[in-house]
Amino acid sequence: MHYHQLAVSGERRLTASRDSTTYDLTSADADLRTFGDLARVASIARTSVDRLAAELTEDADVVDDAFVDRHATVPVDAEEIWAAGVTYQISEQAREEESSMPDMYFDVYDADRPEVFFKATPSRTVEPGDAIGVRGDSEWDVPEPELGIVLRRGEIVGYTVGNDVSSRSIEGENPLYLPQAKVYDRCCSIGPCVVTPEDVEDPHELEMSMTIERDGEVIYDDATNTSEMVRSCDELVSYFTRHNTVPELAVILTGTSLVPEQPFDLQEGDHVDITIEGIGTLSNSVTTV
């Protein structure tokens, strides 16, 4: 199923979509207002998220897609968002080109241990339709479309779409500047929904595309497939959870293979659409922070 978190008249609500019908699960159980609530109760009941949701749909109100789009927020209240780097060959090549120390990216691409780094807190993460940010002290910024792994207590409970906005100029000055290039206000967006593993036959065989518009014209449009990843989702989760007390809910962004080439620079007023097969489209405008 596809799960959306909504904010309606100041209240949280959770919906589930199946066979072109969307159900307001909160109307069936007022205690279930977030995806985390549903996953927690499913775990206690020793059932799957989808099975519990299916039972709730019998007593739930039906809502239309326009209602969901109008009120959608981030699809999961992740306490932490992490990201993986150099998981596609093209990202390794792009970071070599930008860096004063290119060999280190080639080494990570072929290493046993993946690059996994902290990306965002809830306050730095924007919802679908809101504006992602580019740093005012950066000269070269790019959106990075990525498959997001949704975790509950370190276990995969779903997938979403993520945008890992990055300053390539700051990271390119020195790899030690990576936290400043990656972590700042409005540096990340996830959405529009969480899709459970039961509805994703293979997360490593998903079409992914990104379109960027400026002043009403498309200035970037490209597509790829997650089959180009050199790391598996299970591998990234394994390294994330090793010797690490992980939060109740977290998201891992799995890296990108769609990298706009120079002289492209993400600017205030641009509009970014990222689509992943079977999940949906994450749309954001751009602002300067």
UniProtKB/Swiss-Prot annotation:
Organism: Haloferax volcanii (strain ATCC 29605 / DSM 3757 / JCM 8879 / NBRC 14742 / NCIMB 2012 / VKM B-1768 / DS2) (Halobacterium volcanii)
Residues binding Mg(2+), per UniProt: 144, 146, 164
Keywords: Carbohydrate metabolism, Lyase, Magnesium, Metal-binding, Plasmid
Catalytic activity: 2-dehydro-3-deoxy-D-arabinonate = 2,5-dioxopentanoate + H2O
Protein name (record): Probable 2-keto-3-deoxyxylonate dehydratase
Phenotype when the gene is knocked out: Impairs growth on D-xylose as sole energy and carbon substrate.
Family listed: Belongs to the FAH family.
Molecular function GO terms recorded: lyase activity; metal ion binding
Pathway(s) the chain acts in: Carbohydrate metabolism; D-xylose degradation
Induction: Transcriptionally up-regulated by both L-arabinose and D-xylose via the pentose-specific regulator XacR.
Enzyme Commission designation: 4.2.1.141
